Amino acid sequence: MTGIWDVRITDTSLRDGSHHKRHQFIKEEVGAIVAALDAAGVPVIEVTHGDGLGGSSFNYGFSKTPEQELIKLAAQTAKEAKIAFLMLPGVGTKEDIKEAQDNGGSICRIATHCTEADVSIQHFGLARELGLETVGFLMMAHTIAPEKLAAQARIMADAGCQCVYVVDSAGALVLDGVADRVAALVAELGEDAQVGFHGHENLGLGVANSVEAVRAGAKQIDGSVRRFGAGAGNAPVEALIGVFDKIGVKTGIDFFDIADAAEDVVRPAMPAECLLDRNALIMGYSGVYSSFLKHAVRQSERYGVPAHQLLHRAGQRKLIGGQEDQLIDIALEIKREQESGQVASRR
């Protein structure tokens, strides 16, 4: 399939969607989804726990099915698509990378907070030694200026990363904010590495932001069929393909086949639709890491406080991925205010 696209699409519904499903995928679902996406022409399918290799834990949530078994199943099922896996240094290990490759994964996507690219250096080195394709994720990209993001991308590229992504983890970037960051990375990296974009729908701009990214020079774009991802979900792949078809951007994915996959295969595996509701909007507006949604809902139910207030305060505190446990502190703070008669502020 190489060479039939202007932009390469990675479907992340079996990784980012794991957040929405509370990491409860079973083999039958993964096999069916991989087969449908592969048949539609999706070139890359990401499969892992929502928080990457090794993410199954008390802090992030336990997987129903071991992720390495799902990676192996996906690789055995796909006829054309490559299987990607995500790892976060400090969550996953180098041994996890080796095992994922042994199970058929061929693209290693390494994610760090957008100011901490240096922690990925040894992992990129290992991935390249193993012959894996490498992708870097600079998460929460809305929190730093384009030129600073580009400097972090340079660290990843020099370490062996072949494509660095601007990752809008909170769905907080708006159009020009995406274009400016992608353009800054393109200018910095030149021919040394490609640039990608990973969006969320928390302000309803996942598709529009992806178009802006491509126009600014991005060569790889993430999405999830049926928006199956954290928060309000990712840019829906079926919509991305429809839009890219209309503006003349080749993806190699058949629009009708991917629309069928979204409706007939992916939707039945989802616990519910990914909604652009108040909680999701608050995350986009306040700049909250999208995977906080389910954690906030759980603490809301546990302590009897509004989830949207938890999320807004998480944004005020500038919490990042890995700090989900601080939602408990925020919930207790709001609970004390309620009991003392104070009205929790939205601002």
UniProtKB/Swiss-Prot annotation:
PROSITE patterns, alphabetized: PYR_CT
Positions that bind substrate: R15, D16, S169, H198, Y289
E.C. number(s) listed in UniProt: 4.1.3.39
Record-annotated Pyruvate carboxyltransferase domain positions: 7-259
Site (Transition state stabilizer): R15
Major enzyme class: lyase
Superkingdom of this protein's organism: Bacteria
Reaction equation(s) it catalyzes: (S)-4-hydroxy-2-oxopentanoate = acetaldehyde + pyruvate
Catalytic residues identified in the record: H19 (proton acceptor)
Entry keyword set: Aromatic hydrocarbons catabolism, Lyase, Manganese, Metal-binding
Binding site for Mn(2+): D16, H198, H200
Keyword Lyase: yes
GO BP, sorted A to Z: catabolic process; L-leucine biosynthetic process
Pfam families: DmpG_comm, HMGL-like
PANTHER family: 2-ISOPROPYLMALATE SYNTHASE 1, CHLOROPLASTIC-RELATED (PTHR10277:SF9), HOMOCITRATE SYNTHASE-RELATED (PTHR10277)
HAMAP family assigned: HOA
Similarity comment: family membership: Belongs to the 4-hydroxy-2-oxovalerate aldolase family.
Listed name of the protein: 4-hydroxy-2-oxovalerate aldolase 2
Provenance organism: Mycobacterium marinum (strain ATCC BAA-535 / M)
